[in-house]
């Protein structure tokens, strides 16, 4: 285990409690409702910028370096709020990340039951994905990165966490897939 004794910000409990609160709350529909909802739950979006705008979907990210949480991203499709995501704990020592991810996974099991879908890679290349649904919302968690293995890509460990409105997320994915098919047909 690492000797780095910096506090974990946000803590596993803070992340789990916020996600639990958001999943059961009334999901915002419009940009105005989303802004109020984020503010009510302490999600900082100052300095937000549009990073993708195509096929009726927009992706936004807040890059506020003064926020206690990492940058938050969110998606809007056809003017409806779909969901949000974080990349948590980037920069922490590699030997700390798996335990944090497993602790967060355990909290999500308490919140939403066992994952509907889960994939794991054990051993030196340890990582996992887990997916839950509860009340029309999804929680999608990935442990990325890890130790360098010969001939393999290495990235700094990070936990990717997305929380979406299931039906709106499905519509956004279908709209994007349909647009890609149409673009492919339009090419000579």
Features from the language model and the residues they span:
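Short helix/turn-capping signatures at newly exposed starts of structured segments
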Residues: 1-126, 139, 146-188
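Active-site beta-strand termini and strand-to-loop segments that position acidic
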Residues: 131-137
């Amino acid at each position: 285990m690492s000797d780095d004794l910096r506090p974990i910000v946000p803590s596993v409990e803070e992340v789990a409690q916020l996600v639990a609160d958001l999943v059961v709350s009334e999901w915002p529909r419009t940009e105005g409702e989303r802004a109020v909802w984020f503010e009510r739950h302490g999600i900082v979006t100052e300095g937000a910028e549009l990073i993708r705008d195509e096929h009726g979907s927009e992706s936004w990210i807040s890059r506020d370096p003064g926020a206690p949480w990492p940058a938050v991203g969110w998606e809007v499709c056809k003017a409806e709020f779909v969901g949000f995501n974080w990349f948590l704990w980037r920069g922490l020592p590699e030997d700390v990340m798996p335990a944090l991810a497993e602790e967060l996974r355990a909290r999500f099991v308490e919140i939403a039951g066992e994952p509907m879908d889960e994939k794991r890679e054990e051993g030196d290349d340890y990582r996992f994905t887990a997916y839950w649904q509860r009340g029309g919302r999804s929680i999608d968690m990935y442990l990325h990165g890890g130790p360098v293995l010969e001939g393999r890509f290495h990235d700094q460990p990070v936990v990717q966490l997305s929380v979406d409105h299931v039906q709106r997320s499905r519509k956004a994915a279908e709209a994007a897939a349909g647009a890609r098919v149409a673009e492919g047909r339009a090419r000579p």
